[in-house]
Swiss-Prot record:
It is a multi-pass membrane protein. Disulfide bonds: none annotated. InterPro entries: Ni/Co_transpt_high_affinity, NiCoT_RcnA. Residues 34-56, 108-182, 239-259 are cytoplasmic. It comes from Shigella flexneri serotype 5b (strain 8401). PANTHER family: NICKEL/COBALT EFFLUX SYSTEM RCNA, NICKEL_COBALT EFFLUX SYSTEM RCNA. The keyword tRNA-binding does not apply. Induction: By nickel and cobalt. Transcriptionally repressed by RcnR. GO terms for molecular function: monoatomic cation efflux transmembrane transporter activity; nickel cation transmembrane transporter activity. This is Nickel/cobalt efflux system RcnA. It is found in: Cell inner membrane.
Length: 282
């Protein structure tokens, strides 16, 4: 630590900027940075590349902001402040928001399917009742038509549900400010867990009155982190678009994907919450 401090005092840390970018990118590959959760979210909503970039940048911004808040707050509140003491609380808060997001995704998908089925059943009942009144004297033909109608209804269910699902995604996630805020909130939550290494570097720079240098290193670190997170999100968005073009059965699978994605995100939130709670109880 003494040698590193000496290098900072001599101004040699400017040579560390490329290394900080690389370390940030590698740091994004470590567990605990919501890459799986972010990719699952993008896949669940069939997100665009623009939304994937937005999600990754939001996570990076919150990650950097938390580093600054902890560093400055720690210096003001107590000299004995450590990043480890704040991390459990941040994990617990993030877990609550993440689990809430998972529940919202599951409920939105379930409600959409339920409403569609209720509307279809109501329409089928009216159509069957009308058909029964006008063709009651043709018993055999009526029975045959009813069976044929059931088969046709199943085909319409698949096609119409796929169209409804696509329209719902377009309506909810295409250029709507409120939906963009939901994506930003999810990304900001994903970056809540700070990096103790980045906090340590910033604290050292502040103590040595090298605030500009510390800010530059943290920004460089964040650029590397953003490259990783944005790459993960864009990769998920592109993969969804390419698979949909090449595999006709993808739309059928995609109808159930939000359930799996919400479950996966919920498990990540539970895991994060348990670790945060255990850290607080220590």
């Amino acid at each position: 630590m003494t040698e590193f401090t000496t290098l900072l005092q001599q101004g040699n840390a400017w040579f560390f900027i490329p290394s900080a970018i690389l370390l940030g990118a590698l740091h994004g590959l470590e567990p605990g940075h919501s890459k799986t959760m972010m990719a699952a979210f993008i896949i669940a909503i069939k997100g665009t590349i623009k939304q994937a970039v937005m999600l990754g940048l939001a996570a990076t911004i919150s990650h950097t902001a938390v580093v600054w808040l902890i560093a400055f707050g720690g210096m003001v509140i107590s000299k004995r402040f450590t990043a480890q003491s704040a991390e459990p609380w941040l994990q617990l808060i993030s877990a609550v928001i993440i689990i809430g997001t998972a529940f919202w995704m599951f409920w939105r998908t379930w409600r959409g399917e339920r409403n569609w089925l209720e509307n279809m059943h109501g329409h089928d009942y009216e159509h069957h009742h009308h058909h029964h009144d006008h063709e009651h004297h043709q018993d055999h033909e009526h029975h045959h038509d009813q069976g044929h109608h059931h088969h046709h209804e199943h085909g319409e269910y698949q096609d119409a549900h796929a169209r409804a699902h696509a329209n719902d995604i377009k309506r909810r996630f295409d250029g709507r400010e409120v939906i963009n805020w939901q994506i930003l909130l999810f990304g900001l939550t994903g970056g809540f867990i700070p990096c103790p290494a980045a906090i340590t570097v910033l604290l050292i720079c502040i103590q040595l009155k090298a605030l500009t240098l510390g800010a530059t290193l943290v920004v460089s670190f964040s650029i590397g982190l953003a490259l990783t997170l944005v790459t993960v999100g864009v990769g998920a968005a592109i993969s969804v678009q390419q698979v949909a073009k090449r595999w006709s059965g993808f739309n059928t699978l995609a109808k159930r994907a939000p359930y799996f994605s919400s479950l996966l995100i919920g498990l990540v939130g539970v895991y994060m919450g348990v670790h945060g709670f255990m850290g607080i109880m220590r």
